């Protein structure tokens, strides 16, 4: 059964790559284990091409998330992981990257180095980012948060992303 699922999945990826006219490897994001702090570029790098999105983000609570942490909580991995850029698991393992405080673009869209390198190389079609869905938000907006409030994805996503660029 597992083999059947793998064959079916590889067929779906292959067909999707043909439909998108993209190389298969561009559709497959690196696994979280392959991503390190060095793969994160920071919101200022995103701003170079996505100024409207940056300006909209800069007016959100995400842009001020690290400053909202109490001083005592800034050394707790379970708190910091959701208040700086990177996955909570990566931050717990490597510590926060000082130049990337707050919940920046890459906290939700994924590490940007590969995306930026592709775009700068003239391959904007392959400059893909992580798909954002409710599960992305629930990595931090969940019952483990000491200030948890019920999270309604459709209502909240519009507060963060007010622009498509």
Describe the residue ranges of each PLM region.
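Short sequence/structural segments immediately N-terminal
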Residues: 2-5, 14-165
């Amino acid at each position: 059964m597992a083999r059947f699922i793998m064959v079916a999945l590889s067929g779906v990826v292959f067909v999707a790559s043909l439909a998108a006219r993209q190389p298969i490897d561009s559709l497959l994001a690196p696994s979280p284990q392959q991503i390190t702090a060095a793969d994160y570029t920071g919101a200022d790098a995103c701003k170079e091409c996505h100024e409207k999105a940056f300006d909209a983000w800069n007016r959100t609570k995400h842009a001020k998330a690290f400053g909202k942490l109490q001083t005592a909580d800034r050394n707790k991995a379970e708190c910091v992981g959701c208040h700086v850029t990177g996955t909570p698991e990566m931050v717990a393992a490597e510590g926060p990257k000082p130049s990337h405080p707050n919940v920046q673009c890459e906290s939700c869209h994924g590490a940007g180095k590969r995306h930026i390198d592709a775009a700068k190389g003239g391959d904007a079609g392959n400059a893909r980012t992580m798909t954002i869905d409710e599960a992305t938000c629930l990595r931090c907006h969940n019952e483990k948060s000491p200030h948890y409030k019920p999270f309604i994805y459709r209502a909240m996503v519009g507060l963060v992303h007010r622009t498509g660029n």
